[in-house]
């Protein structure tokens, strides 16, 4: 599915290659056989708007959206396992899937990075690729809702993936669930996370329990992302 390759490229950090190969991407969108006309048009508008931006501005926008906080992270398992030990095993299992299909990662790539997962799905037969999208549909809906809340044009990419997945997820209900969710990308929220990481570090070094408990209490209300249980259709 060439559409998955296109979205994968658009969800990667916008480097010089995006501008160099934009015409090829426009042509691939126009040749798509899996997108209704209106969806192909929306994808083309997204690409046009992105490539008319100054590259530095596009890169800053991307980093602010996807690299600050966890709520809009493109690491899939961040929204399922958080920092639990299950995440490591899930990574190993996904990496094994990639290797079975001949996809080799370099040492800097994480297997649950959404653009990489889409690239993997694009190599599969269409029916299997659609099933792979359905597997992550609750995460896609969550990311779409959070990006819409932030009035980001990137939300259109996640809505497009949900349509390709032909999923029955109610996006309006997902939006309602996160309506009152505190943002985790504010300076205050990021500072709280940094402070918490310092506590963990000092705890590992043998600090007294009472000091750690007192410090943690200060950040008991720090922003924490909601994690999904994908076995229940994405319910929190």
UniProtKB/Swiss-Prot annotation:
UniProt xrefs under Gene3D superfamilies: TorD-like (1.10.3480.10)
Chief site of localization: cytoplasm
Presence of keyword Chaperone: yes
UniProt subcellular location: Cytoplasm
One annotated GO molecular function: metallochaperone activity
Subunit composition and interactions: Binds specifically to the NarG subunit of the apoenzyme complex at two distinct sites, one interfering with membrane anchoring and another being involved in molybdenum insertion.
Database matches in PANTHER family: NITRATE REDUCTASE MOLYBDENUM COFACTOR ASSEMBLY CHAPERONE (PTHR43680), NITRATE REDUCTASE MOLYBDENUM COFACTOR ASSEMBLY CHAPERONE NARJ (PTHR43680:SF2)
Protein name, UniProt field: Nitrate reductase molybdenum cofactor assembly chaperone NarJ
Annotated organism of origin: Escherichia coli (strain K12)
Name of the encoding gene: narJ
């Amino acid at each position: 599915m060439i559409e998955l390759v296109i979205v994968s490229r658009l969800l990667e950090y916008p480097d010089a290659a995006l501008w160099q190969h934009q015409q090829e991407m426009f042509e691939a969108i126009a040749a798509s056989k899996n997108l209704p006309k209106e969806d192909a048009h929306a994808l083309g508008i997204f690409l046009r708007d992105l490539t008319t931006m100054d590259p530095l501005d596009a890169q800053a926008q991307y980093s602010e959206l996807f690299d600050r906080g966890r709520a809009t992270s493109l690491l899939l398992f961040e929204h399922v396992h958080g920092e639990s030990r299950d995440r490591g095993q899930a990574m190993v299992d996904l990496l094994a899937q990639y290797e079975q299909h001949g996809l080799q990662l370099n040492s800097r790539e994480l297997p649950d990075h959404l653009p990489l997962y889409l690239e993997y799905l694009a190599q599969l037969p269409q029916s299997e690729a659609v099933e792979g999208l359905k597997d992550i549909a609750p995460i896609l809906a969550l990311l779409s809702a959070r990006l819409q809340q932030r009035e980001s044009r990137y939300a259109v990419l996640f809505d497009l993936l949900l349509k390709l997945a032909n999923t029955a997820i109610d996006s309006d209900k997902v939006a309602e669930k996160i309506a009152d969710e505190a943002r985790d990308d504010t300076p205050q929220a990021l500072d709280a996370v940094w402070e918490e990481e310092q506590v963990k570090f000092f705890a590992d070094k043998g600090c007294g329990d009472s000091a750690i408990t007192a410090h943690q209490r200060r950040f008991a209300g720090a922003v924490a992302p909601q994690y999904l249980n994908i076995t229940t259709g994405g319910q929190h």
